[in-house]
Swiss-Prot record:
Family (UniProt): Belongs to the GINS4/SLD5 family.
Name of protein: DNA replication complex GINS protein sld5
Entries under SUPFAM superfamilies matching the protein: GINS helical bundle-like (SSF158573), PriA/YqbF domain (SSF160059)
UniProt cross-references to CDD domains, sorted A to Z: GINS_A_Sld5 (cd11711), GINS_B_Sld5 (cd21692)
Keyword terms, alphabetized: Chromosome partition, DNA replication, Nucleus
Complex and partners: Component of the GINS complex which is a heterotetramer of sld5, psf1, psf2 and psf3. Interacts with sld5.
InterPro entries, per database record: GINS_A, GINS_bundle-like_dom_sf, GINS_Sld5, SLD5_C, Sld5_GINS_A
The encoding gene: sld5
Compartments, record wording: Nucleus
A GO BP annotation: double-strand break repair via break-induced replication
């Protein structure tokens, strides 16, 4: 029996499209937020499963067709687009872990935002950095001066994200009560509004999905 490649290619369902949109939202949020956001484990897991299933379907379709159909090429292109977003999302998180490793490690609540592989990466990263510093110069200085997390006054050796940086956001859900943005300033959050605010005042709403960064 001869199979038609087009018969093997399944059109994206609403659920699949929603997962891709959710992944894109997580990706943009992660890129625009100064700090590390909770890892989107459920979304990433579903997207990875569907990438693998689609890859197998495409291989079967191409293998059973005398010529690659135009439809399969489109599906391959779409697959690469999803993989690009996923890779960029993961790279963005790794870059933040590299930049704020000591800060993340010193805040147990932030460790909960990491996936299991990310926690392993952070631990290994810190071990390598500490060993490098010790071998390079820390062995030669007094013990009380070889810490990597010292703080003098308002100056800290530990790099931390700027939580007061300005960000653009879009409101996904209206909030009934007035929203405090400074000591004497309140605004309303209405669905569809696009605002520029200090990240620190909307970070909780971002994690709740009330707003998204743009």
């Amino acid at each position: 029996m001869e199979w038609d490649a087009d018969d093997l290619l399944i059109e994206p369902t609403t659920e699949v499209e929603n997962d891709y949109e959710d992944l894109c939202t997580q990706w943009v949020n992660e890129r625009m937020a100064p700090d590390l956001l909770p890892f989107a484990e459920e979304i990433v897991s579903r997207v990875l499963d569907r990438i693998e299933a689609q890859r197998e379907t495409l291989q079967l379709a191409i293998g059973t067709s005398s010529a690659t159909s135009y439809r399969s090429v489109l599906m391959q292109t779409e697959l690469e687009r999803v993989k690009f977003v996923l890779r960029s999302y993961m790279r963005t998180r790794i870059n933040k872990i590299d930049k704020y490793a000591q800060y993340i490690q010193s805040h147990p609540n932030l460790l909960l935002y990491l996936s299991s592989p990310e926690r392993q990466y952070l631990l290994r990263h810190q071990q390598i950095v500490h060993r490098h510093y010790m071998d390079s110069f820390l062995r030669e200085v007094p013990a009380k001066m070889n810490k990597l997390d010292d703080k003098v006054g308002n100056l800290s050796m530990v790099a931390s994200p700027d939580m007061d940086t300005a960000v653009f956001c879009v409101v996904n859900e209206s909030v009934e009560e007035n929203f405090r943005v400074s000591e004497n300033e309140y605004i309303t959050l209405d669905k569809g509004d696009v605002l520029i605010l200090r990240y620190s005042v909307i970070s909780d709403y971002l994690r709740l999905g009330v707003v998204s960064l743009i």
